[in-house]
Regions:
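C-terminal accessory/binding modules appended to enzymatic or scaffolding proteins
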Residues: 13-21, 433-475, 841-857
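Glycine-rich phosphate/ribose-binding loops and adjacent secondary-structure elements
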Residues: 364-366, 459, 466-474, 486-493, ...
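A short, small-residue-rich loop immediately preceding and capping a beta-strand
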Residues: 477-483, 501, 862
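Short beta->alpha connector loops at strand-helix junctions that form conserved
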Residues: 45, 482-484, 503-506, 594, ...
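Conserved alpha/beta-domain cores
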Residues: 98-99, 551, 561-907
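Nucleotide/phosphate-binding sheet-loop regions of phosphoryl- and nucleotidyl-transfer enzymes
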Residues: 1-423, 450, 456-459, 466-471, ...
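Long, charged amphipathic helices and adjacent flexible linkers at domain junctions
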Residues: 69, 237, 399-451, 457-458, ...
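Structural motif
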Residues: 249, 442, 459-461, 480, ...
Length: 907
């Protein structure tokens, strides 16, 4: 643990820097760095992430004792630089207390503003500033925020009413005002008193008047917020470890709510939605930062071009825009010029798109935060390629800047343009996060989660979202909000998740109580379908059809860069020519797994398959298999043709035979009729196929050994298809894979059957094709005896699904009953069927690759389980020298990027 617990910054100096994210969190490290490069930042200090972990180890009282001297000295540091005193009524210092983890977690943890106010300080501050409205507006905000965050009065359930919001609405109604900003000084003073009374009633405790007590309450509340429900969920979604902890940054307050020369805002150095190299953002005059991020007031645009685009979408004339909604560039030109200059400086310093928060206090600009901005998958790719072209980063950095999982967003369907032409537009909002979303309306986050779990596609409709809505946002196809701009919580989180979002739709009249939303006089109920276009901000009635996404030139350039540096090829798992062709378009270098059993379930094929299963002699089975052979050959021909010139690895029959027979009476009666036998005969045969543990039973190569005619038929179908294609001038490259090998003798026996069948096929067609025989390593014993098996196998394909099952002893079908408990108790960090277990299963794979290549130096090795498209698993494969990873077609680009990153990490 770091000995130093508190780091100071301010007045162009800082004890930390941008490289200290682990100790100071992203926010603290960047606040220090901005001081070093001359960006105006209010003075303050950062408490390290180690202290957060210590808080959970030793408790609140002990951590306060350990930190007390350092924190009091740090407060004195701020007092000296600001020339005012914490808790002093005549010349008071107020501070903000903010969280800041190593990785950005927007809105997931807590912030407290205006800390240090009490009745005496407020009175003195009002006299000093001659602006009592600003002071008591800040005071009521502080009491509410402190009650919500520190005293934990924020409602947890959707049916609970926020006591503070209820009081505000009551006072506004009594005073005849609509907006919070129109409340009088007396109204604001009344709110402070009523808020304190509500705190006393709800908690049994008085609101703390001592600023030091307030400060410790806030610091410990931020530590606590690291383990709040939404933060835990966000970390799971983003793969952020619980052990990182959060830092706490305490800064002198600067005020955006001191009048018309004050403002607050959020800005981005590039467009976070589409990656366009255009400075953009939003600001509010006479407001505090939380107003912008929370989306409670819809803000104005910072740039003139942004304002004009917004007005055009909203149907507002240029004259009205200039009069009512001027951009900062027009309304505050000097501040805008300074802001624009600093954002450019920050982007060039960090060499990445920046997300910045700022406040203007009576004409002076202050920066409160900068961080690498969250962005959509499309923006991620465009920004990386643009920065490369601009000379700000090199090729390797461009590859490493991109998150493999986010490429998935680029492959999602988009609205069909023809369908859009006839679709009914019911509302226009801001294009907060691009994409196409169709679903049934729900109004609460927990309903979105429940409906999603029941198999429904939903659109979450809210007045505005808050961090508590995270689980519902993750479950929804898209998010629609009545309030909030392009930098609101809904917009920022949706972009980070890759979710479609339309925000700031003023035409929405949402009733949570009735579960309805009214748009231009038309009422839409929970369960009604709507569609969102997150690229244009348009909302449509009903379901609008979608089509496959069109990939950009930037995407192709990124993929070409990946191929330049990668050593691990990416193949695909494909059972149909259509899947094979799609994967080829995504850059797959062949097929790593074709599952032959999926081909048997079409009507005519399943009848012949069942006839083979029912047969009680070799002759009977061969007769049925002869019917199957032309079907199989046609299937294989289509796949080999789609992958012409690339290898196609075909797995022989793997599942147990009982999967091909009906287990219900109606199905058995149909089968009996098809076979021309009695239902009793069918029942007897079905019963005879039953196994207590089919996963370890009569399947894979065991089927081929007990029924070699199955292996022979499949070999003839594969090689027959290849011979036909060769005669047509094509270049088929078949690979025949024997599944579930546990001993070398199993492989030897199956290899003999395959080679004998191959001779027959080549004699029949009068031509030969080159093919390879390999095996699937999915039994631990096969991995441990790889040195033996490699003498017979030309390649190894690791079936990581079954290898994980047999190494852990977990059933993939049953793990869901205990996995949540294992994850919660930290027995497992991740689902081993989603992310390859590198310490156990991975060690077996590494051992088998090494042992196999000692016997056969040119042994080709790949994986073809679900892990073949999971980035960390692909990187592992690259690092241990495997030849390929195979995954589903839509994950091919993800695996290509991960493979390139794995190669670069090995340099």
């Amino acid at each position: 643990m770091s000995q130093k617990r508190v780091y100071l910054f301010g007045n162009g100096k800082a004890e930390g820097n941008a490289k200290m994210r682990e100790e100071l969190g992203g926010k603290g490290a960047n606040l220090a760095e901005m001081n070093h490069i001359g960006v105006p930042v209010p003075p303050g200090f950062t408490i390290t992430t180690d202290c957060c972990n210590e808080y959970y180890q030793v408790g609140q009282q002990k951590i306060m004792e350990l930190l007390n001297d350092d924190v009091m000295a740090a407060v004195k540091h701020i007092e000296d630089l600001m020339n005012c005193k914490f808790g002093d009524a005549k010349n008071p210092l107020l501070v903000s207390v903010r969280s800041g983890a190593r990785a950005s977690m927007p809105g997931m943890m807590d912030t407290i503003l205006n800390l240090g106010l009490n009745d005496e300080v407020a009175e003195g501050m009002a006299a000093k500033t001659n602006n009592p409205h600003f002071v008591y507006d800040s005071y009521r905000r502080f009491v509410q925020m402190y009650g919500d965050v520190v005293l934990e009065m924020k409602p947890v359930n959707k049916t609970d009413i926020d006591p503070f919001e209820e009081i505000i609405e009551k006072v506004k109604k009594e005073s005849g005002v609509v907006l919070d900003k129109d409340l009088s000084v007396e109204d604001l003073k009344k709110l402070v008193k009523l808020f304190k009374a509500a705190i006393k009633e709800r908690t049994g405790k008085d609101f703390p008047n001592d600023p030091i007590e307030q400060l410790w309450g806030a610091i410990c509340a931020v530590f606590r917020s690291w383990m709040n429900e939404r933060a835990i969920l966000y970390r799971k979604m983003e793969g952020i470890p619980d052990e990182w902890g959060t830092a706490v940054s305490v800064m002198a307050m600067v005020f955006g709510n001191m009048g018309d020369t004050s403002a607050t805002g959020v800005c981005f150095s590039r467009d976070a939605a589409n990656g366009e190299n255009l400075f953009n953002g939003e600001y509010l005059v006479n407001a505090q930062g939380e107003d912008v991020v929370a989306g409670i007031r819809t803000p104005q645009q910072i740039t003139k071009i942004g304002s004009q685009r917004w007005a055009e979408r909203a149907g507002i004339s240029e004259a009205e825009r200039v009069a009512k909604y001027p951009s900062m560039e027009e309304a505050m030109p000097e501040i805008y010029a300074e802001l624009n200059s600093i954002q450019d400086k920050l982007e060039h310093h960090y060499h990445d798109m920046q997300d910045m928060e700022f406040t203007v206090q009576e004409g002076k600009l202050w920066f409160l935060q900068t961080r690498n901005g969250k962005r959509t998958g499309a923006a991620m790719v465009k920004i990386a390629i643009d920065l490369l072209h601009e000379g700000m980063i090199d090729e390797k950095t461009a590859i490493q800047r991109c998150e493999p999982q986010k490429l998935d967003e680029l492959l999602h369907p988009v609205f069909d343009k023809k369908a859009l032409a006839s679709a009914k537009v019911i509302a226009q909002g801001l294009p907060a996060s691009p994409g196409a979303a169709c679903g049934q309306i729900v109004f609460h986050a927990d309903d979105a989660e429940a409906w999603h779990n029941d198999g429904h596609k939903v659109v979450l409709v809210r007045i505005e979202t808050s961090p508590e809505d995270l689980a519902g946002m993750a479950s929804a196809e898209g998010i629609l909000t009545a309030r909030g701009g392009m930098t609101s919580h809904a917009a920022v989180v949706a972009r980070g998740m890759g979710k479609c979002c339309v925000s700031g739709v003023g035409a929405l009249n949402v009733s949570y109580k009735d579960k309805t939303v009214e748009i231009d006089g038309v009422v839409y109920k929970e369960g009604d379908y709507i569609s969102l276009n997150g690229t244009t901000g348009q909302v449509y009635a009903g379901e609008v059809p979608t089509k496959a996404a069109e990939l950009s030139g930037d995407f192709k350039e990124l993929m070409d860069l990946c191929d330049k540096y990668t050593k691990l090829q990416v193949r695909t798992n494909a059972d149909t020519p259509r899947d094979a062709q799609l994967a080829r378009e995504f850059g797959a270098k062949g097929i790593g797994l074709t599952r032959t059993e999926h081909m048997f379930f079409e009507d005519k094929k399943i009848v012949a398959m069942r006839e083979m299963i029912l047969a009680d002699s070799v002759a009977g089975r061969e007769k049925a298999l002869a019917k199957l052979l032309p079907y199989q050959k046609a299937d294989f021909k289509g796949i080999l043709e789609a992958m012409d010139g690339l290898p196609v690895n075909i797995r022989l029959l793997d599942p147990p035979l009982h999967e091909f027979v009906p287990h219900d009476l109606a199905g058995q009666e149909t089968m009996a009729k098809e076979m021309g036998v009695s239902v009793e005969d069918i029942k007897r045969r079905v019963d005879s196929l039953a196994e207590n543990n089919p996963m370890l039973g009569h399947r894979g190569c065991r089927l081929g050994i007990t029924f070699p005619e199955i292996t022979a038929m499949q070999t003839k179908a594969i090689l027959g298809a290849a011979c036909e294609l060769k005669k047509e001038g094509k270049n088929p490259m078949p690979e025949i894979m024997v599944p579930l090998i546990g001993t070398i003798n199993e492989l030897k026996q199956q290899k003999e059957v395959i080679q004998y069948a191959a001779k027959e096929v080549f004699a029949e067609y009068g031509t030969e094709v080159e093919f390879e025989i390999g095996t699937m390593i999915e039994i631990p014993r096969a991995a441990l005896t790889a040195y033996l098996i490699a003498s017979e196998a030309q390649y190894f394909s690791f079936g990581t699904n079954d290898l994980t099952q047999m190494t852990f002893g977990y059933s993939r079908d049953d793990i869901a009953s205990f996995l949540p408990v294992y994850l919660d108790k930290k027995i497992l960090k991740v689902d081993p069927f989603q992310v390859l277990d590198q310490k156990g299963v991975g060690r077996l794979i590494k051992f088998a690759v090494k042992e196999g290549r000692e016997v056969r130096p040119d042994l080709r090795c790949g994986i073809c389980g679900e892990h073949g498209g999971e980035p960390s698993s692909v990187k592992f494969c690259a690092k241990i020298g495997m030849n390929y990873a195979s995954c589903s077609p839509f994950r091919v680009p993800i695996a290509r990027l991960a493979a390139a990153q794995g190669a670069l990490e090995c340099e």
